[in-house]
Amino acid sequence: MASSVLEMIKEEVTCPICLELLKEPVSADCNHSFCRACITLNYESNRNTDGKGNCPVCRVPYPFGNLRPNLHVANIVERLKGFKSIPEEEQKVNICAQHGEKLRLFCRKDMMVICWLCERSQEHRGHQTALIEEVDQEYKEKLQGALWKLMKKAKICDEWQDDLQLQRVDWENQIQINVENVQRQFKGLRDLLDSKENEELQKLKKEKKEVMEKLEESENELEDQTELVRDLISDVEHHLELSTLEMLQGANCVLRRSQSLSLQQPQTVPQKRKRTFQAPDLKGMLQVYQGLMDIQQYWVHMTLHARNNAVIAINKEKRQIQYRSYNTVPVSEIYHLGVLGYPALSSGKHYWEVDISRSDAWLLGLNDGKCAQPQLHSKEEMGIKKNLHSQIKQNVLFQPKCGYWVIGMKNPSVYKAFDECSITHNSSILVISLPDRPSRVGVFLDRKAGTLSFYDVSNCGALIYRFYDPAFPVEVYPYFNPMKCSEPMTICGPPS
């Protein structure tokens, strides 16, 4: 019993690294104890990138500087060294089970401890043997080497575990982003359908009001006619009840009234006014909207570059621009009202949106960064001034050959694209027909494809206009011009 207790105590004060009684025992934060030399060597060969080591027993990280001497364990070790008795279990372990002799030899071929009779037996005869004291240090070093290799492998496993944890976090984040993206896109689709449903319901509500007002008017007219007929019937019946003399005296008047009475059939709603609801091309709408959502992934964050211009105001976030002067600006100076967005766009795909819901005059698109004033050839500039002579050729101020790729609105019903003929390169103003006034315009630049597209975000992302110019300059800049409208234009941020 005493020997069992002694073995338990020795096990508690044995170094997990060298498997010997602890020498200069130190303890880590996890309370496991090691020889100072062993844990120092272990830390030097296995410390993490953050300067911490991992406990060889429980793998819990620890700062090397936190190792503390364990005097209590050191005292126990010193007392055990003075204890000379050999436990019964150790005595049994040191005795050959076959011959009853002490195990003093080590067979190198069979890698086992034997007694002197085993050495002479047929099983081990001729094998190289040595005293166990002679191979003690050799095999300790081998085991120590094996331990270091295993600990390195354990470190590799820990690194792999860290990599897996990072991958887990990355995947969770990516999937969460995808979940939010799916939810946002389907919310957009639901909002789109709700908007279209509301439009149709408003049309029906308006139609119902018009029809009911018309029918009510017809009912009132019919009621007036009915009252006239009944009054006349009452007069005729009254005359029939009179004496012959009295009847004949009033008959002529009553008959004239009766003969002159003509009925007009009340107006009804013609059958052609009736309409059967036809759902819009939802498939086409969704395809267009999906296309818009696909390019919205290229949303670029930009700011407006403040220019030294007294008539232009830019807010401190540099995302809103408006005309603030009440002085008359000459037509030839309108280009000065333009402001560039940054950064420059030199490659790849880029998308941004502009809120123009309150503006009734604006220009949007790209500029080559020079904002140079083009040579004017006529008095016709964006339709603001009329030609002085019908033979004067129309040219535009904002055209691709002058470094502008823009569309604009002069008033809520006139939309124009300032392009040029791909063959003659003559400037031209193209009038754009839109079903509704856009409140938000999306702009998409694809440098590789050489296209600049404008979308009506407020109308399911319908395409407004597209420039095809594979020869864009090396650097182009988003261009914003509030014209002479005092209402602001605002660069929108991406949806949250």
From Swiss-Prot:
- What keywords would UniProt list here? Coiled coil, Cytoplasm, DNA-binding, Metal-binding, Nucleus, Transcription, Transcription regulation, Zinc, Zinc-finger
State the PROSITE patterns in the record. Answer: B302_SPRY, ZF_BBOX, ZF_RING_1, ZF_RING_2
**UniProt motif Nuclear localization signal: location:** 268-276
Sorted alphabetically, the Gene Ontology cellular component annotations on this record are: cytoplasm; nucleus
Domain B30.2/SPRY, first and last residues per copy: 281-496
Task: Report residue spans for region: Highly hydrophilic.
Answer: 205-210
Q: Which domain of life is it from?
A: Eukaryota
How is this protein induced?
A: By the TLR ligands lipopolysaccharide, CpG dinucleotide and polyinosinic-polycytidylic acid.
Instruction: Report the outcome of residue 35 to S.
Output: Reduced interaction with NR2C2 and enhanced interaction with TAB2 and TAB3. Does not decrease TAB2 or TAB3 expression. No effect on inhibition of ROS or negative regulation of NLRP3 inflammasome activation
Positions annotated as zinc finger (RING-type): 15-59
Q: Where are the zinc fingers (B box-type)?
A: 91-132
Summarize where Zn(2+) binds, as residue positions: 96, 99, 118, 124
Tissue spec: Highly expressed in spleen and lymph nodes (at protein level).
Cell compartment(s), UniProt: Cytoplasm; Nucleus
> What stretch or stretches form a coiled coil here?
173-239
Q: What is this protein called?
A: Tripartite motif-containing protein 30A
Species: Mus musculus
